[in-house]
Amino acid sequence: MNRKLIAVFLRIFKGLHMTQIIIDHNPSQEKLKELGVSSWSIWDCEPSKFPLDFGMTESAYVLEGEIRVTPQGGETVVIKAGDFVVFPKGLKSNWEVTKQLKKHYKHS
């Protein structure tokens, strides 16, 4: 069921030719459980700055920390602990990890 939900979610956004970062600042525990977020891989990063290009769509749930992400040609967004985020395939961005980052993530 988790894969079906993710597939539907991504199909909807791919149909819209998603080019922006999508942030849910207050996802419900039900949504996180349905997506199986707790079983996703975990990535940690110390405060730093670096470019990041997405070859695949990434869904992520931030457990700790804060990052400022600036999409190429777009406005900077701040992503914090508790946020659920979708970074679209093809996104070119610059990241500034301002507080030690820990996130669950999944590529599709």
Task: Label the predicted regions.
Residues 2-42:
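A short, N-terminal "cap"/entry segment at the start of jelly-roll beta-barrel domains
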Residues 26-28, 36-55, 88-89:
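Conserved short histidine dyad/triad with adjacent acidic residue
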Residues 33-34, 50-55, 71, 77-78, ...:
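Short histidine-centered beta-strand/loop micro-motifs
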Residues 52, 69, 103-105:
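Short hydrophobic/aromatic-rich beta-strand segments that constitute the beta-sheet cores
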Residues 54-69:
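Short, conserved beta-strand element in jelly-roll/cupin
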Residues 73-89:
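Short acidic-glycine-tyrosine-enriched beta hairpin
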Residues 89-108:
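Ligand-binding loop in jelly-roll beta-barrel domains
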